[in-house]
Amino acid sequence: MAKKKVVLAFSGGLDTSFCVKYLSEECGYDVYTAIANTGGFNQEELKSIEERAYKLGAVQHATLDITQEYYQKSIKYMVFGNILRNGTYPISVSSERIFQAIAIINYAKEIGADYVAHGSTGAGNDQVRFDLTFQILAPEIGIITPTRDMTLTREYEIEYLKKHGYTADFKKMEYSINKGLWGTSIGGKETLKSNQTLPESAYPSQMTATQSKTITLDFVKGEIAGINGKAYDNKVAAIQDLEALAAPYAIGRDMHIGDTIIGIKGRVGFEAAAPMLIIAAHKMLEKHTLTKWQQYWKDQVGTWYGMFLHEAQYLEPVMRDIEAFLDSSQQNVTGRVIIELHPYRYVLVLSLIH
């Protein structure tokens, strides 16, 4: 009798590593792992994740590149709306999860999977984003969530993997790191309380730049179009290059405290150098190019758009209506912004209108 197929949304982190081993060893499924890359991983990292999947027992692994789609359908509008949840968080993981879920469920349908699985816990928002998207787009495919259903701790998962012969840097696995084009979130024991901060070592990007630097960002109709005079047709490449330029200053680090979709408080650390610089520069440019009423209504609509995106409502038709408004608002948002980079901070210096 053929084994049941399950497609697992796989990042290579602790929770999904546990899920591969558990679903194959304990449940007897053929596990097909898939990573939906939103631009946070380079080719070397993707290769390492693939090797990890096979080492854990996956029968097949797929890398789904959705970076350009993610930019065109989400990041662009988050910039247009200057979206920072609670004035702090650039909705890094929140926004990419929906597109990852769409890619994963489409892959599951493509290979004829019986089930789809993810490694989300029962405490956060990702479980809702995955479940809701899966249920809307493929209600006939069952959903398996081992980490949530068994209320597992990270310590338990580490011990389980050790007992089953899987070796890794388990010290590093003590932190849940979600890396994407629009920022990286970091969760660990410190984020479970309100009076602790993440250690420097928990951040993937370390502060190595000590000399201040002045850079310029160019925008055309609201979109990032140039860095230091270099023009970019590929907006994803512009974001990646700006991240490489600014991340060594440890810019864009913060702790976000917010209300989860399920109604409890959540706390997470993040680093997002490029997103924070782009949003700040874009907003400064808009002050010169939009009327006060355009700015006012865009602030209201942008807040709603960010809230809906955060709460797994991307597929709600009103989101397309809001995007049409945001597109219209950017017709005159063209110019250059000068920024000074310093360790742990930045200063907006000047905005030049083209």
Annotate the PLM regions:
Residues A2-I353:
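Nucleotide-activated chemistry modules centered on ATP-dependent adenylation/adenylyltransferase
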